[in-house]
């Protein structure tokens, strides 16, 4: 089993490998547990070996991330008389761990949470780093809190029943970690794309562990996204490709998987980086190639740029110019794989041109 340490204020470990979930009972250590999970996973909860627990069912995927689901969760916690000494377990995909984390952050002003992610995306990203949140009509993840888990169990056995689409979507986040910090990930996936998509392979475990190591290092240095300034990049480097991706998800009414939208977002970020940061033509082309090889989309030409641009105004990386009061867009870009920089207030015409290039088939 692989272990990755997340060295934040309260350090915790991410356990990665087959059978990791069997360590949950020991981590709960006799406390009462509220397991937050979708209905499709309820039948697996008895395997945890926890005697005293309550199950809080939530909808699948992004449908879970609503204020209404939170209110129901708080009601269930109250009915179960959950105390500050008890614990919440987030068991599911990234949306489930987001909701479980937010419930833990807000119940009695904060109780412990452990995440047992069941998708590649949740293992590589959502379950690690303490970000929680829900969506509102104005945008994705606009309401939330930072609340770190006390442990994360990435049991690769839980991935074996995932649809291929979910595996591909999650692998997009792993590819992202290759571009922002660890180019070895890109080499491994380029050389072995089929094995990278096989959740039972050692190749998959290697790139997953590398991606988690990247995420752990970034959040350990900048847990609350406070290192980033107008031009500097701290934890926001994890949002490479996300500015466009979140806009696409909103316009697609969340019918696209996050990784699918982020794949297009990374192509856009590469084009923007080519324009402003001197990213080579070769890396721009490689971005398209590696994402295509694992079955992810690299274009989204059915949505007009003007519509996406309006949605970007509520992106969390946007800042207000103190002198003019004008909203300033900021994009995470790369000079080369592993070398990140912030692109601040790019020209509107350049943005449209990069999207056109991104959408060109």
Curated annotation (Swiss-Prot):
Pathway: Metabolic intermediate biosynthesis; chorismate biosynthesis; chorismate from D-erythrose 4-phosphate and phosphoenolpyruvate: step 2/7
Major location category of this protein: cytoplasm
Compartments where found: Cytoplasm
Cofactor, free-text remark: Binds 1 divalent metal cation per subunit. Can use either Co(2+) or Zn(2+).
UniProt key word Repeat: no
InterPro entries according to UniProt: Dehydroquinate_synthase, DHQ_synth_AroB, DHQ_synth_fam, DHQS/DOIS_N, DHQS_C
Name this polypeptide is given: 3-dehydroquinate synthase
Top-level taxonomy: Bacteria, Bacillati, Actinomycetota, Actinomycetes, Propionibacteriales
């Amino acid at each position: 089993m692989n272990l990755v340490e997340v060295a934040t204020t309260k350090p915790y470990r991410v356990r990665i490998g087959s059978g990791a979930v069997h360590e949950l009972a020991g981590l709960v250590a006799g406390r009462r547990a509220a397991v937050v999970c979708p209905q499709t996973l309820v039948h697996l909860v008895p395997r945890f070996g926890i005697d005293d627990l309550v199950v809080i069912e939530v909808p699948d995927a992004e449908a879970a991330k609503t204020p209404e689901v939170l209110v129901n969760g708080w009601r269930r916690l109250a009915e179960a008389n959950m105390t500050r000494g008890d614990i919440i377990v987030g068991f599911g995909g990234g949306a489930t761990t987001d909701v479980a984390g937010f419930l833990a952050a807000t119940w009695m002003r904060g109780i412990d949470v452990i995440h047992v992610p069941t998708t590649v995306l949740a293992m590589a990203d959502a379950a690690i780093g303490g970000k929680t949140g829900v969506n509102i009509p104005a945008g994705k993840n606009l309401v939330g809190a930072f609340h770190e888990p006390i442990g994360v169990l990435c049991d690769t056995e839980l991935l074996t029943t995932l649809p291929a689409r979910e595996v591909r979507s999650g692998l997009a986040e792993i590819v992202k970690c290759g571009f922002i910090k660890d180019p070895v990930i890109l080499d491994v996936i380029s050389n072995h794309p089929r094995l990278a998509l096989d959740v039972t392979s050692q190749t998959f475990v290697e790139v997953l562990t590398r991606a988690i190591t990247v995420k752990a290092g970034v959040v350990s240095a900048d847990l609350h996204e406070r290192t980033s300034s107008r031009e500097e990049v701290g934890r926001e480097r994890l949002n490479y490709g996300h500015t466009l991706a979140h806009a696409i998800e909103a316009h697609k009414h969340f019918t696209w998987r996050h990784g699918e939208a982020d794949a297009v977002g990374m192509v856009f970020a590469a084009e923007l980086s080519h324009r402003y940061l001197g990213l080579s033509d070769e890396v721009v082309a490689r971005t398209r190639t590696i994402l295509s090889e694992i079955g992810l989309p690299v274009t989204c030409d059915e949505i007009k740029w003007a519509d996406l641009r309006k949605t970007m105004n509520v992106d969390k990386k946007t800042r207000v110019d103190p002198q003019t009061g004008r909203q300033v867009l900021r994009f995470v870009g790369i000079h080369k794989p592993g070398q990140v920089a912030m692109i601040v207030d790019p020209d509107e015409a350049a943005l449209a041109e990069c999207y056109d290039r991104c959408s060109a088939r």
